[in-house]
Each structure stands twice: as structure tokens, then as C-alpha cells.
Amino acid sequence: MFPNRKTAAMDRLAFLHDSLFSPIERHLDGLVPLLARFVFAATLLMYFWSSALTKLGDGIMGIFVPSTGAYAQIFPKQMEAVVYDVSQLSIFHWAVVVAGTWAEFILPLLIVIGLFTRLAALGMIGFVVVQSLTDLYGHGGIAHAETLGAWFDKVPDSVILDQRAFWMLILVTLVIKGAGALSFDRILSRQILGAPATA
């Protein structure tokens, strides 16, 4: 008798839960990627653009001739080895620095406007991984426990394992869900392809 009452109560609770949250999931699911893009814009867009600006060289050709600081940020140990003489580095180093600088401008912009969002978010995941490894092993952050941090501890603000885990969560959400309703991806998919957005 009592088990039946307990089962009935659980059934009513499950029904109430589904009645409340199923419509929310059904109608507001597209809000998740939109919120992810908003949070990215509010917290990370200017961070990446400010970082990219420090990498530009002088004048209009600065987009092709990065600053010395750009090389020092991306290849710190190699720059130390050549006593910060950029002319001693190879074309490979130049190509990586230029590509990284452009990526810091272009990929965040694509995410914010919702254009090729999945590809841009995937590119940013790769960028953040390389950035984090450079911070740890190039700039010596691995030697400082507070920089690396740790999961499941009481300190929530380490640069790598805590902060960038949240960055990754936003980016992975966009890779999985796409840009959401208010995006260029949605406009392109409906007007040009006549299909739901997949970019």
C-alpha cells in the first residue's frame, strides 16, 4: 500500500517537472547559444582584440609586420635565444605570429555576429589551447601553482584550469549548438540554402 502511494507521488512529481520544464526546453533551447555569444562578447571580445592590437607593427603594414612584442608573446623562449632580434627568426615564426594576430581579430568577431560560428568557435578552442600551453611552458606559468590552478579545490580563479575552463565551455556550447536564432548563420541558411543553420 505505502509503496504504491510513494510511486504515485513520484509520478505526480515527475509529471509536474516535465510539465514545467519541457516547454522551457522546447521553446527556449535556441536561447542557449545566443547567451553564450553574448557572454563571449561581454567578457572576451575586447580581451582578444586588445591582445591582438599589441601584436601589430607600425603603420598600415603592421598587419603583415608584427611588433617585436608579438614574437615575444608567442615564441618567448626563441626570442630569448636570439636576444629579441626578430631578423634571426624564420618565416615559420612570422607566419605563425601573423596568423595568430589575425585569428585574434577575426574569430571573435565571427562568433559575436554569428557567422560560421561553429568553425570560429572550433578555431578559438585551438587558439586557447595553444595560448594556455604557451603561458604554461613558454612564459613559465607551470612553475606557479596559482597560475595553473586545480579543479575541485576552494580557489575558483586560477588563470588556466579555472578561468579557461569557462572559456572552453562557452566555445564548446557554440560548436555543439551553433549560433542560435539571431545570427548571420541563420540568415544565410534560410535565405540562401533554405535549410536550418549548421555553421
Language model regions located:
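Extended, low-polarity transmembrane helix blocks
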Residues: 2-78, 87-106, 113-199
